[in-house]
Amino acid sequence: MLYLIYGVDKAGEEGRALRAAMREAHFTYLEEHARIIVLGGATLTDRPDDTRTGSVLIVNVASRAEADAFANNEPFHKAGLFARYTVTRMRRGQWNPAGAPKTAEGD
């Protein structure tokens, strides 16, 4: 089953400090769970500095319990980075790997 995990960072310095402090642990956690991650990335502002505003992950797991366990143990979430956080079951509709950007920031 696919689940969309979406977190919106706390605003201001608190959010920036938590994101910076937990960045390494976050990426280590994602590497440890790479087998279930379909897609992931940060949400950004439209400003030139690309300030991060949150995180999105799509995971492929066997159950809601597994999705919740993954989400609840994710380091950004555990550290209290997010002002809002949701885990929502989803269905894949359109799928166009050829349309994916070649770089992390897009083409």
What is each model feature region?
Residues 1-107:
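Conserved, structured core segments of small domains
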